[in-house]
Amino acid sequence: MTNIVFMGTPAFAAPILEGIIENGYNVLAVVTQPDRPVGRKRVLHASPVKEVALKYGIKVFQPVKLSGSDEMQEIIDLQPDLIVTAAYGQFLPTKLIESVKIAAINVHGSLLPKYRGGAPVQYSIMNGDDKTGVTIIYMVKKMDAGDMLAQAELKIESTDDTGTIFEKMSILGRDVLLETLPKIISGNVEAVKQDENKVVFSPNIKPEEEILHLNLEAKEIDWKTRALRPAPGAYFKNFKGKRTKLWSIKPLEEKTEFAPGYVVNVDKHELKVSAYNGTVYSIIELQPAGKQKMDITSYLNGVGQGLKIGQRIIEDEE
């Protein structure tokens, strides 16, 4: 029986862990991020991966910092055949990677070498890509740079956001991993080097990247709102005087002479706004600061009452 240590944290990784367990591999331990405080009462919540581990009675390690920790030495002492990682959230020290009997492998959420880093799904949507996927790689010291062992594509639909892509990708990642594991264990896997000339990075989203600007076309505003949904959300700093998140919009075919940020058309159930380069979009769902999410009808009947065609409602500065 192959002994595995699994390392992962979010919902994306949970079906992958469960698939490994259900397919007869012996999971010696699970390593995940520490429980996080959630909500106004700051109640500690276990990661989705920890919940799976507890369900199956598997030992859990949650080091604040893995490198140099007592937990890392305990993991090494388990002498696993494989380490499998999926969105764990910390770098793996070389000492740990090199301690395994067969290999340390990673399930990465992109078509490598495109989008190395912590936010591959967000960047694929934000850049308007029509596909993404998963890649199984050997783990090396350099981030997401190991040889590729398997890869599978996933279509990005016009309605997809980061949440829906992660849901689909977790199942795809599970299936591709389970198909590839026997080849890795037997030594019959073909390892393909990544083309360093085609590397694109996708670092974690910074707070300033959540801001929507008036130099974006309607389709780019759509890409960004979907990339940052369900969290943290994309926002204009000054939308009718308030910081306002746009949760859902629809880019339209029509064009306008208005500069970006003006009301192109408004009635009881629709608000069309001008964007860069004469493009236009319709707002479907939004959230002014201090308010709950609301559909556009609720907004126009409340906070947004009295808007008129030709009125400027968005500015780049607060």
UniProtKB/Swiss-Prot annotation:
Disulfide bonding pattern of the chain: none
Record key words, sorted: Protein biosynthesis, Transferase
Reactions this protein catalyses: L-methionyl-tRNA(fMet) + (6R)-10-formyltetrahydrofolate = N-formyl-L-methionyl-tRNA(fMet) + (6S)-5,6,7,8-tetrahydrofolate + H(+)
Annotated residues for binding of (6S)-5,6,7,8-tetrahydrofolate: 110-113
InterPro entries for the chain: Fmt, Formyl_trans_C, Formyl_trans_C_sf, Formyl_transf_N, Formyl_transf_N_sf, Formyl_transferase-like_C_sf, GART_AS, Met-tRNA-FMT_C
UniProt function note: Attaches a formyl group to the free amino group of methionyl-tRNA(fMet). The formyl group appears to play a dual role in the initiator identity of N-formylmethionyl-tRNA by promoting its recognition by IF2 and preventing the misappropriation of this tRNA by the elongation apparatus.
Stated name of the protein: Methionyl-tRNA formyltransferase
Annotated organism of origin: Ligilactobacillus salivarius (strain UCC118) (Lactobacillus salivarius)
Organism ancestry: Bacteria, Bacillati, Bacillota, Bacilli, Lactobacillales
